[in-house]
Each structure stands twice: as C-alpha cells, then as structure tokens.
C-alpha cells in the first residue's frame, strides 16, 4: 500500500505533548492573516500598520480572567512567553486563544523579542513537513 490513508485522522496530539503542557488551559491557534503573505512583506509600512500582535480571547474566558479588549496579555508555556494586546471576541471558542502566525519578534510593541513562534514546538507535520502549530497549549494572563 502506497501513500496516505484517505480517511483523515482527527486525533489531537495531546499524547505527544510534554506532561507540563497537557494541563495548560488554552489551545493556541495561529493562522495566517490576509494582510500579508506569511512574514515576507512585513517590512512594508502599510502592511505593518495592521496590528498583527492581537490575541483573540472568548468573552467567557476574558470575563473570568478580568481581561478587556486593549489590555496587554501574556501567553506562556514551558517553551517561553509572548505578549500581545487582547481582543475579546466570539470568533474563538472558550478555551481557545488566537494570534497571527509569523509575527516579527523585533517589531512587537507589547514585548520586544516575543512572538507566537516562541510558544510552539519544532515538530513537523506528517504530510508536507510543515510546522505543527495546531497542538500548542498555553496559559493566558493579564500582563
């Protein structure tokens, strides 16, 4: 038999996570944003004007943690920490936080030399050898 199984395996990757990460309360999503192609053009002034350093938080989680839109927040896990500005929205489910991928560390106004990638693993996906950002868990707190 050659190739990949045509049936998608939707098993989450918690079994491969370090023990200290499995119990962290938030799943981090870090998709691309339409305002730029990965990080290739982030040096262009009008593209940089778009705030790529937001952390979207569900209203239920934000209320429980005392976080409001515009507050500086800290995401952290055993790999590191990163700072963002909160955006409270129903676009993310409870227990999920969302930041944009490919932020430049040197341009983060909320915490110099921090970005989403400092929280993710170096593990690659089985299909395509891409970064496996979809299985990252973090803490969220007001900074």
Describe the predicted segments one by one.
Residues 39-41, 45-143:
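Long, contiguous, secondary-structure-rich segments that constitute the structural scaffold
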Residues 1-45:
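Long, low-complexity segments enriched in small/aliphatic residues
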């Amino acid at each position: 038999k050659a190739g990949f199984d045509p049936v998608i395996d939707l098993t989450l990757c918690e079994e491969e996570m370090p023990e200290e990460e499995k119990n962290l309360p938030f799943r981090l999503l870090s998709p691309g944003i339409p305002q730029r192609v990965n990080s290739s053009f982030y040096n262009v002034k009008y593209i940089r004007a778009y705030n790529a350093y937001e952390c979207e938080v569900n209203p239920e989680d934000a209320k429980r943690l005392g976080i409001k839109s515009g507050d500086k927040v800290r995401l952290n896990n055993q790999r590191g920490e990163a700072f963002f500005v909160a955006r409270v929205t129903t676009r993310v489910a409870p227990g999920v936080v969302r930041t944009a991928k490919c932020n430049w560390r040197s341009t983060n106004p909320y915490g110099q030399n921090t970005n989403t990638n400092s929280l993710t693993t170096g593990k690659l996906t089985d299909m395509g050898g891409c970064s496996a950002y979809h299985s990252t868990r973090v803490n969220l707190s007001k900074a």
